[in-house]
Amino acid sequence: MNPIRRRKIEAEAVRTVAMMILSGKVKDPRVHMVSVHRAEISEDGKNMKVFVTAICTDKKKIKVLSGLNSASGLFQATLSGKLGLRITPRMHFLWDEEYIQSLDESLRLTRKPTNTD
Protein backbone atom coordinates (compact mmCIF):
# COMPACT_ATOMS: atom_id res chain seq x y z
CA MET A 1 0.00 0.00 0.00
CA ASN A 2 1.19 3.49 -0.83
CA PRO A 3 2.64 5.18 2.31
CA ILE A 4 0.67 8.38 1.69
CA ARG A 5 -2.57 6.44 1.33
CA ARG A 6 -1.73 4.46 4.48
CA ARG A 7 -1.20 7.66 6.52
CA LYS A 8 -4.48 9.08 5.23
CA ILE A 9 -6.39 5.97 6.31
CA GLU A 10 -4.66 5.94 9.71
CA ALA A 11 -5.46 9.60 10.34
CA GLU A 12 -9.09 9.15 9.29
CA ALA A 13 -9.39 6.09 11.55
CA VAL A 14 -8.22 8.12 14.56
CA ARG A 15 -10.67 10.93 13.71
CA THR A 16 -13.56 8.53 13.10
CA VAL A 17 -13.13 6.52 16.30
CA ALA A 18 -12.67 9.64 18.43
CA MET A 19 -15.68 11.37 16.87
CA MET A 20 -17.93 8.36 17.31
CA ILE A 21 -16.97 7.98 20.98
CA LEU A 22 -17.40 11.69 21.72
CA SER A 23 -20.70 11.98 19.89
CA GLY A 24 -22.19 9.04 21.79
CA LYS A 25 -22.67 6.77 18.77
CA VAL A 26 -20.98 3.97 20.70
CA LYS A 27 -23.66 2.84 23.16
CA ASP A 28 -21.43 0.41 25.08
CA PRO A 29 -21.15 1.65 28.70
CA ARG A 30 -17.59 0.30 28.91
CA VAL A 31 -16.45 2.86 26.35
CA HIS A 32 -16.14 6.30 27.92
CA MET A 33 -13.40 8.84 28.58
CA VAL A 34 -11.20 7.27 25.89
CA SER A 35 -8.39 9.09 24.09
CA VAL A 36 -7.43 7.79 20.66
CA HIS A 37 -3.76 8.47 19.98
CA ARG A 38 -2.68 6.77 16.79
CA ALA A 39 -3.37 3.98 14.34
CA GLU A 40 -1.07 1.69 12.37
CA ILE A 41 -2.32 -0.18 9.32
CA SER A 42 -0.62 -3.34 8.05
CA GLU A 43 1.17 -3.44 4.69
CA ASP A 44 -1.66 -5.39 3.07
CA GLY A 45 -4.32 -3.07 4.53
CA LYS A 46 -6.27 -5.89 6.17
CA ASN A 47 -5.49 -5.13 9.83
CA MET A 48 -5.16 -1.96 11.85
CA LYS A 49 -3.92 -1.39 15.39
CA VAL A 50 -5.63 1.54 17.12
CA PHE A 51 -3.82 2.79 20.23
CA VAL A 52 -5.93 4.28 23.02
CA THR A 53 -5.75 5.35 26.67
CA ALA A 54 -8.29 6.29 29.32
CA ILE A 55 -8.25 7.49 32.89
CA CYS A 56 -9.07 4.26 34.69
CA THR A 57 -7.76 1.38 36.78
CA ASP A 58 -6.11 -1.70 35.31
CA LYS A 59 -9.32 -3.71 35.74
CA LYS A 60 -11.31 -1.06 33.94
CA LYS A 61 -8.68 -0.89 31.19
CA ILE A 62 -9.51 -4.45 30.16
CA LYS A 63 -13.21 -3.57 30.02
CA VAL A 64 -12.55 -0.45 27.93
CA LEU A 65 -10.50 -2.45 25.41
CA SER A 66 -13.14 -5.17 25.34
CA GLY A 67 -15.86 -2.60 24.66
CA LEU A 68 -13.86 -0.98 21.87
CA ASN A 69 -13.04 -4.31 20.26
CA SER A 70 -16.71 -5.33 20.37
CA ALA A 71 -17.65 -2.05 18.63
CA SER A 72 -14.92 -2.42 16.00
CA GLY A 73 -17.44 -3.45 13.32
CA LEU A 74 -19.27 -0.14 13.74
CA PHE A 75 -15.99 1.78 13.42
CA GLN A 76 -14.95 -0.25 10.37
CA ALA A 77 -18.27 0.30 8.58
CA THR A 78 -18.11 4.05 9.21
CA LEU A 79 -14.50 4.28 8.05
CA SER A 80 -15.27 2.28 4.92
CA GLY A 81 -18.17 4.58 4.07
CA LYS A 82 -16.08 7.72 4.55
CA LEU A 83 -13.11 6.58 2.49
CA GLY A 84 -14.80 4.24 0.01
CA LEU A 85 -12.41 1.40 0.83
CA ARG A 86 -12.59 -1.85 -1.09
CA ILE A 87 -10.91 -3.70 1.78
CA THR A 88 -11.79 -2.37 5.21
CA PRO A 89 -9.04 -3.03 7.75
CA ARG A 90 -9.99 -5.09 10.81
CA MET A 91 -9.47 -2.83 13.83
CA HIS A 92 -7.72 -4.12 16.93
CA PHE A 93 -7.67 -1.79 19.94
CA LEU A 94 -4.56 -1.74 22.12
CA TRP A 95 -3.49 0.23 25.19
CA ASP A 96 -0.91 2.88 24.24
CA GLU A 97 1.91 2.13 26.69
CA GLU A 98 4.33 4.26 24.64
CA TYR A 99 2.16 7.35 25.18
CA ILE A 100 1.90 6.70 28.91
CA GLN A 101 5.69 6.27 29.17
CA SER A 102 6.26 9.54 27.32
CA LEU A 103 3.89 11.32 29.72
CA ASP A 104 5.71 9.85 32.71
CA GLU A 105 9.04 10.94 31.25
CA SER A 106 7.74 14.47 30.60
CA LEU A 107 6.45 14.75 34.15
CA ARG A 108 9.73 13.50 35.52
CA LEU A 109 11.70 16.05 33.50
CA THR A 110 9.47 18.99 34.40
CA ARG A 111 9.46 18.37 38.13
CA LYS A 112 11.56 20.85 39.98
CA PRO A 113 14.18 19.35 42.24
CA THR A 114 13.39 19.95 45.88
CA ASN A 115 16.07 21.32 48.14
CA THR A 116 16.13 19.67 51.53
CA ASP A 117 18.97 21.83 52.81
Swiss-Prot record:
Gene3D superfamilies: 3.30.300.20
Name the record gives this protein: Ribosome-binding factor A
Entries under NCBIfam families matching the protein: rbfA
Gene encoding the protein: rbfA
Classification via SUPFAM superfamilies: Ribosome-binding factor A, RbfA
GO BP term, pick one: ribosome biogenesis
Database matches in InterPro entries: KH_dom-like_a/b, RbfA, RbfA_dom_sf, Ribosome-bd_factorA_CS
Gene Ontology, cellular component aspect: cytosol
Keyword Mitochondrion: no
PROSITE patterns: RBFA
Function recorded in the entry: One of several proteins that assist in the late maturation steps of the functional core of the 30S ribosomal subunit. Associates with free 30S ribosomal subunits (but not with 30S subunits that are part of 70S ribosomes or polysomes). Required for efficient processing of 16S rRNA. May interact with the 5'-terminal helix region of 16S rRNA.
One GO molecular-function entry: ribosomal small subunit binding
Subcellular location: Cytoplasm
Species of provenance: Leptospira interrogans serogroup Icterohaemorrhagiae serovar Lai (strain 56601)
Pfam families tied to this protein: RBFA (PF02033)
Entry keywords, A to Z: Cytoplasm, Ribosome biogenesis
Major location category of this protein: cytoplasm
Assigned protein family: Belongs to the RbfA family.
Subunit structure: Monomer. Binds 30S ribosomal subunits, but not 50S ribosomal subunits or 70S ribosomes.
Record has Cytoplasm as a keyword: yes
